[in-house]
């Protein structure tokens, strides 16, 4: 049975939209990492630069390379010994390499290699996995899904040319990155087209504006977990291989049940 991977979010920033400042100290971050492991997480994604809604595109100028290193490396050093896969959410190859040297095995690049062209070479050198997220300034010359597919497949091809195997390249449709609500609805409805590329797909909707708008009511980020879980279920039905979430326990339980139901359906169809 194919297991949906649960990627737990560990933001070590003071300003992330959902949990900024909660895990800013190493001790707090380690405590949360242990909690997620107990809750069944498959991958812990450590991030040192905010991508909160409305955050400026010049975040790489606001948070220096040195500051990102100072936020991320002590946490990675403290948790990489645990029996769980560690990912680092960064668009800088220098941060990626420093973390990969410590034993990290996945890089989650919100700019899909577009910000730092050396990212693919670094990830390839260490035999790691990479997540490529659809991003941009929101201006596009073709419909959103078509533009997303062209952009992500172009970057995935560059990653493969750099030596990263096909099955180690994850595609993230970029919910929460510059898209209108209608464009995000279109992307969600057509997730199967991204799945059809045969790259593993990671869905990252957790607590985002899209979830708030889907609920059609004012809500704090922590009040959006059940609606996030609905997108997890929907994504699994569409064929995504992983989900990036804040509430690990809820989504782990849901994903286990969805995986069982999908496997049950598959077996019965192939018995008949």
Curated annotation (Swiss-Prot):
Per the UniProt entry, the Enzyme Commission number(s) are 2.5.1.15
Q: Where is the Pterin-binding domain?
A: 1-256
Q: Specify whether Ligase is a keyword of the entry.
A: no
Concerning InterPro entries, the annotation shows: DHP_synth-like (IPR045031), DHP_synth_dom (IPR006390), Dihydropteroate_synth-like_sf (IPR011005), Pterin-binding_dom (IPR000489)
**Keyword list, A-Z:** Folate biosynthesis, Magnesium, Metal-binding, Transferase
Task: List, alphabetically, the SUPFAM superfamilies matched.
Answer: Dihydropteroate synthetase-like
Signal sequence bounds: none
Keyword Magnesium in annotation: yes
A GO cellular component annotation here is: cytosol
Enzymatic class: transferase
Binding of (7,8-dihydropterin-6-yl)methyl diphosphate, residues: 51, 89, 108, 172, 208, 244-246
Cite a single Pfam family from the UniProt record. Pterin_bind
What pathway is it annotated to?
A: Cofactor biosynthesis; tetrahydrofolate biosynthesis; 7,8-dihydrofolate from 2-amino-4-hydroxy-6-hydroxymethyl-7,8-dihydropteridine diphosphate and 4-aminobenzoate: step 1/2
By sequence similarity, the record places it as follows:
Belongs to the DHPS family.
Subunit comment for this entry? Homodimer.
Query: What is the documented function of this protein?
Result: Catalyzes the condensation of para-aminobenzoate (pABA) with 6-hydroxymethyl-7,8-dihydropterin diphosphate (DHPt-PP) to form 7,8-dihydropteroate (H2Pte), the immediate precursor of folate derivatives.
Protein name in UniProt? Dihydropteroate synthase
